[in-house]
UniProtKB/Swiss-Prot annotation:
Identification of the protein by name: U3-ctenitoxin-Asp1a
Any GO MF annotation of the entry: toxin activity
Compartmental location: Secreted
Domain of life: Eukaryota
Keyword Secreted assigned: yes
Length: 50
C-alpha cells in the first residue's frame, strides 16, 4: 500500500485510510465499485488546502 497524506494522493479506486494499526495513512482499495470512502478515515482535501 502506498502512503498518503490526502485522498488526492491515491488512485480513483483507492481511499486514503488513517488506521491506528499503521504509523501513517495509506492508500487502500475501495470496497466495491462506486463506493465512497468513509469520511472519518480519509484526509479531507478541503482541509488540506489551508
Amino acid at each position: 500500500a502506498n502512503a498518503c497524506t490526502k485522498q488526492a494522493d491515491c488512485a480513483e479506486d483507492e481511499c486514503c485510510l488513517d488506521n491506528l494499526f499503521f504509523k501513517r495513512p495509506y492508500c487502500e482499495m475501495r470496497y466495491g465499485a462506486g463506493k465512497r470512502c468513509a469520511a472519518a478515515s480519509v484526509y479531507k482535501e478541503d482541509k488540506d488546502l489551508y
